[in-house]
Each structure stands twice: as C-alpha cells, then as structure tokens.
C-alpha cells in the first residue's frame, strides 16, 4: 500500500535539492541512500564525466520471487532552470508548489519519488513480485543528453514505465524521441 504522507515527505525532500541538468550529484546521493536503505543493489555509470556533469545514470536491481521477466521503472533526476535554491511549499489543501522564485522540480522528481515509494511499499508488503530494474537518468532536460550514454543492452526488462508525462492520471505515451525500443 502506498503511504501518501510518506510519499509527500519524500517528494518535498527531493524537491528541496538543487538539481539543474548536469548538476544532479546531490539528488543522486539522496537516491543512493534510499536504495541502500531498501537493500537494493545499485551502480552509477560514467555518464557524468562524458557530459561534463557531476553524476552519472543510476541503475538499481531488486530481485523478485516470481518467475517473471523484470520490469523497468525510470525517471530523470534533473529539472529545467531555475532549479537552484528551490523551496517547495505544502499548502493546507495538499497541493505542493514552488515559492515562485524557482521551478518546483516535479518534472521529474515526482517520478523519482513515486518509484522509490512504490518499491518501498512492495518490499514492506512482503508480497511476491517480479524482478524490478530501476533507472534514474541525468541531464534529460537538454535533449536526453545523459540517457544517450546508458548501456541499454545491460537491461533485462522488455517492459518499462518511464514516469515523465503530463496529463490526466492513467495517460501513457507509446512513442517519443527517447522511448526505449
């Protein structure tokens, strides 16, 4: 079961971290700490160096007890500018906004938070699940600069959910310039 209060706190924490493109190290460290808490093996690639950034793409793997192919969950760690000095504000009605001086960073830290909470909830439930691959990429905003350097053949998943889309809940994109084929 998803814990909405915990998800809100997680998003607020992530949205408080500076995360302009190619400067995602602090967000990456936060995610790595979350993955460590969950006992999820992770690795960071060398993309940061290739794109003159301070962090690489993060890959995580959570084994599953079900004999099913893994599924990939993905979101990017950067936000459009201005993404430095962010102050997310939780309003009494439950909405979250920026303070108006920067972006909120919901694109795509909301996706990062949703993935981390979903994985935590699955683990806490004790329910058998299929293996889960996680991919958190850097420098998505400047034309997917970071994900272009990821080692896609290393992925086992044939199905993926990339949590980076605006629109009504339940909307899905089936084609885009950077959709994994």
Residue ranges of each PLM-predicted region?
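Short glycine- and acidic-rich boundary segments immediately preceding or forming the N-terminal edge
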Residues: 18, 22-25, 33-38
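Active-site metal-coordination/substrate-binding segment of hydrolases
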Residues: 28, 34, 53-54, 61-63, ...
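N-terminal capping segment at the start of a domain
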Residues: 1-22
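Metal-dependent peptidase/peptidase-like ectodomains
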Residues: 3, 147-181
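Short glycine-rich loop/turn motifs
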Residues: 55-58, 181
């Amino acid at each position: 079961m998803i814990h909405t209060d915990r998800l809100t706190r997680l998003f607020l924490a992530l949205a408080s971290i500076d995360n302009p493109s190619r400067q995602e190290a602090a967000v990456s460290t936060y995610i790595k700490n979350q993955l460590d808490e969950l006992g999820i093996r992770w690795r960071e690639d060398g993309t940061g160096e290739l794109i003159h950034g301070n962090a690489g793409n993060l890959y995580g793997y959570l084994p599953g007890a079900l004999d099913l192919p893994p599924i990939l969950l993905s979101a990017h760690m950067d936000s459009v500018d201005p993404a430095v000095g962010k102050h997310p504000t939780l309003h009494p009605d439950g909405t979250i906004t920026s303070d108006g001086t920067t972006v909120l960073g919901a694109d795509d830290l909301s996706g990062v938070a949703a993935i981390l909470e979903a994985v935590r909830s699955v683990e806490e439930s004790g329910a058998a699940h299929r293996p889960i691959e996680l991919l958190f990429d850097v420098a998505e905003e400047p034309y997917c600069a970071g994900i272009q350097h990821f080692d896609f053949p290393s992925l086992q998943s044939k199905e993926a959910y990339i949590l980076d889309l605006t629109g009504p809940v339940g909307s899905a994109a089936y084609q885009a310039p950077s959709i994994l084929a």
